[in-house]
Amino acid sequence: MSLQPVQFGDEGQVATRELAVRYREACLRDARLVALRPGFDMLEAIDRQYGGSRRLELEDTDELVAGLLNDLARLRAEPELALGVALWAMRHEVEMGAVEVVVNALAQRSNNAKSPQELSAVFGLMQGLIANVTPLLSADLERSNPERPWRILHINFAITAIRTEDPAMMDFAFDALDEALPGERGGFYSEALALVLAPGVAPAVRERIEARHLKWTAGR
């Protein structure tokens, strides 16, 4: 029988404390980050008072999150810090006004993932981010900008799903992309199909991409 350590606080509070530890360690490597301590302290203080995983009705929490994310992006801080702040916002259903740095952090984590389990975890985080930012970005008002976070997030979501080779995840991500980026569906599946024709790609992956490609390019 193995002994399990006792944790104080709910899972959200534990995650926020772990973020605080990562932040303090990052400060030792980059002294510029010390200026952000009031914001990180506030995340912990809110968790202590309201719990770590509940919707917040507090004023200015969205500004707190956006400020931290913008500062982390400006200082080019370690991506995991931005991801930690974003996860705090997701747990509390706080809208994120600064999305690009989080999208980039998730892309890096996806690129570094080596196992199906790691890819599935990134998939879940991307799914949560899409749910959080949909009210803010779903109008997709910057369609002329190929680097806009709404587009990059959905493209990365679909690519991560393909890498999992999980049919259900691919179907979910493809449905999300089809709805979010109607003008780019055909192009995405054309490029994806060219890649999955290589040997060694699972049949389920190829079949699903072929079906979407046919759906959105037939009759062009």
Task: Annotate each PLM feature.
Residues M1-S2, E80-A89, M126-R143:
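Repeat-mediated protein-protein interaction surfaces in helical alpha-solenoids
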Residues M1-G67:
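N-terminal alpha-helical scaffold/docking segments in eukaryotic complex subunits
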Residues P146-R220:
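Alpha-helical oligomerization segments
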